[in-house]
Amino acid sequence: MFNKFDTKPLWEVSKTLSSVAQGLEPADMVIINSRLINVCTREVIENTDVAISCGRIALVGDAKHCIGENTEVIDAKGQYIAPGFLDGHIHVESSMLSVSEYARSVVPHGTVGIYMDPHEICNVLGLNGVRYMIEDGKGTPLKNMVTTPSCVPAVPGFEDTGAAVGPEDVRETMKWDEIVGLGEMMNFPGILYSTDHAHGVVGETLKASKTVTGHYSLPETGKGLNGYIASGVRCCHESTRAEDALAKMRLGMYAMFREGSAWHDLKEVSKAITENKVDSRFAVLISDDTHPHTLLKDGHLDHIIKRAIEEGIEPLTAIQMVTINCAQCFQMDHELGSITPGKCADIVFIEDLKDVKITKVIIDGNLVAKGGLLTTSIAKYDYPEDAMNSMHIKNKITPDSFNIMAPNKEKITARVIEIIPERVGTYERHVELNVKDDKVQCDPSKDVLKAVVFERHHETGTAGYGFVKGFGIKRGAMAATVAHDAHNLLVIGTNDEDMALAANTLIECGGGMVAVQDGKVLGLVPLPIAGLMSNKPLEEMAEMVEKLDSAWKEIGCDIVSPFMTMALIPLACLPELRLTNRGLVDCNKFEFVSLFVEE
């Protein structure tokens, strides 16, 4: 039963709300002179009042009779009011911010609730990491609704993570007040091949009558997609083509249109609505992964709504996609997602619908943001020691740690991972490389860099070796512990010396992201919380990330959010070719393949 994210549950205040609506008791707050965006009927209702009591909406209409001596009256002065915005799929860890700092960053932009999938920290710290993020969020006004990570590891047997989550763990977490469903079921092969583990975690969620969120990245809309949805998966954010999003909506699956820092899918997938003229009730706008400099520069869901409008989606439709549609997806529309009697009093004031400029934000009947700034305090949370000490590398990393051997060869053909800028997929390419002193050489002239993934959770000493293409770097190295989803230590570069320096720099600072050239650190973002997040403020983090972005450009890479693209190199649930600490993975066949192509 949903009652964790309200000031008071409806059954405790139903008499009061009914009395306030009838003028028998005064409201706590009344908003007057607003232009109500009614997401239930997709219309603007002029000159509308809203009466609020006990953190909930008591009346929508003429509320003069609800105003008492101590009622707080807010004059909207003709501004639009809309339900508070909900992000249906977000990994807070990708912001590199703590949950409390993330809340401070997004609430002034109209975001009142997030459906957080903390599978990044869970891969490092297990369910303890999930608990830490829940505790961090409790001191904020933001409604932090959590989905239990479903795929830890993302694809069992192909990588080493800090923890594992099974059906029995999911069953236990479904009892937690903050858990509203299951995080993205990335192991779609497990669903389609009917593995006990995949169907077990889905089944435990369905038994609890909670929402199973999805991740179906295959460009297939027939029997596979049908089988995936039939298992109980309710939504998916992995559509990159309009036809994929349309097919999912037609099958009753909520298609989540993604617009984050690195993945700009909205331009294409919005055509599912604009070109096909279909009902948009099964469409939701989400961010998935957003970096600090993006939050600081562009905002959050307000920016994504604006982008949707720019792509031809009607403003009221776009607002439905971050309010009632999202609430219905998570079976919470009886509590969230609309400005209607009985619902949580989560309301945003919008100056105009073209620029989606947010002027005020109310959560649970309290004014929490005004003029782009938070007006309420947020409690600081200190992460425990195990979260701050997550770098467990067995062997000392030296330049020799990056040797890729091919004895008695002068040249060899290697499988190379080619990235696709601003997309999550990769291509498998075959490239001939030189061998010197039995060591395979990368080739920056062909845009081919060396890549190594070191296990960092259990001191196993394992490492996977490969090559990547598409970054455009001529000299230098990059390293990151943000390396989805196992978050081992990933290093790419043109020479072993810079690669060793990059790796050891992150080991010393507890994890993060770094760019190195000619023995010099050009940009560093320390992420001491599980090697994923920092307790620094947004502005400071944005500055460090911007400096790192500049460092990438300095060494020759000009793609958008290159560190996010780099972070997906080890993610073995996405096509086509990936590298984990155990080796090179063909993600179409889900099998390990040799680094070298057999002649």
Swiss-Prot record:
NCBIfam families: ade (TIGR01178)
Catalytic activity: adenine + H2O + H(+) = hypoxanthine + NH4(+)
Protein family: Belongs to the metallo-dependent hydrolases superfamily. Adenine deaminase family.
Database matches in InterPro entries: Adenine_deam (IPR006679), Adenine_deam_C (IPR026912), Amidohydro-rel (IPR006680), Metal-dep_hydrolase_composite (IPR011059), Metal_Hydrolase (IPR032466)
Keywords carried by this UniProt record: Hydrolase, Manganese
Gene Ontology biological process terms from the UniProt entry: adenine catabolic process
EC number(s) per entry: 3.5.4.2
UniProt-listed Gene3D superfamilies: Metal-dependent hydrolases (3.20.20.140), Urease, subunit C, domain 1 (2.30.40.10)
UniProt lineage: Bacteria, Bacillati, Bacillota, Clostridia, Eubacteriales
Protein name (record): Adenine deaminase
MF GO annotations: adenine deaminase activity
